[in-house]
A protein has these predicted regions:
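Peptidoglycan-targeting cell-wall enzymes and recognition modules
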Residues: 2-15, 19, 43-153
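Acidic helix/loop microenvironments that form the catalytic cleft of cell-wall polysaccharide enzymes
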Residues: 42-45, 164-182
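Alpha-helical scaffolds flanking conserved acidic
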Residues: 1, 31-40, 166-172
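Short, mixed-charge amphipathic alpha-helical segments
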Residues: 25-30, 136-142, 164-167
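Non-transmembrane alpha-helical segments in soluble domains
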Residues: 21, 39-42, 151-152, 173, ...
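N-terminal carbohydrate-binding/catalytic regions of secreted carbohydrate-active enzymes
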Residues: 10-37
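Low-complexity, Gly/Ser/Thr/Pro-rich intrinsically disordered linker/tail segments
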Residues: 175-204
Length: 204
């Protein structure tokens, strides 16, 4: 069981101890290594458990860098820059179970939670697993309990426990991020958490 004191040492809100422990129990995140990896990966995704909703307030140049196929010119990017709702509805349209841009699904099911659950399909399947209708009330995913529970659901269904046990940090990061963005930071936070848990930081 993780304690509020341990979370304080990791600069994580101690009030998250109970929902974290509930998540760890439900999804069998049951060793120091697994728990440290969960904190390291999710901490990178959500500002060390401080930000449970995706920030989509991007400038035109950033849009062109992040989604070059969707924003091939500055003229197109300028039509969306600084408008998070319009950006989400465009970049997340017709994927991840979302309908077209006009439906509003992109913004409705934008990234939320400790692992940035995104898209209608993710909200639906996480809700089915947890017995909560996240499709009807997507904002629930940004509340502390469900921010962590949905992350635990994703972690469990994507084989992250096994990757953490194997200390496959690259593979684990790819499962969560789709690439290796922030790999060094994720590994560093995992090592820090492991040190707090058992006095070790050995990740290999």
């Amino acid at each position: 069981m993780i304690t509020p004191a341990q979370l304080s040492r990791l600069h994580i809100d101690p009030a998250l101890a109970d929902p974290l422990n509930a998540t760890f129990i439900k999804f069998k995140i049951d060793t120091d290594r697994k728990q440290a990896a969960f904190l390291g990966q999710c901490g990178h995704e959500c500002g060390n458990f401080k930000i449970f909703e995706e920030n989509l307030n991007y400038r035109a140049a950033t849009l062109m860098k992040l989604w070059p196929k969707r924003f091939p010119t500055l003229e197109i990017a300028n039509q969306y820059a600084g408008n998070p709702k319009k950006i989400a509805n465009m970049v997340y349209a017709n994927r991840m179970g979302n309908r077209d841009e006009a439906s509003g699904d992109g913004y409705r099911f934008r990234g939320r939670g400790a692992i940035q659950l995104t898209g209608h399909s993710g909200y639906y399947h996480a809700g089915q697993a947890l017995g909560v209708d996240f499709v009807a009330d997507p904002d629930l995913v940004a509340t502390p309990l469900y921010a962590l529970m949905t992350a635990g659901w994703f972690w469990s269904t994507h084989g992250c426990n096994e990757l953490a046990d194997a200390m496959n940090w690259v593979g684990l990061t790819k499962k969560i991020n789709g690439g290796t963005i922030g790999l060094d930071d994720r590994v560093a936070h995992t090592a820090l958490a492991l040190n707090v848990f058992d006095g070790s930081s050995a990740l290999a």
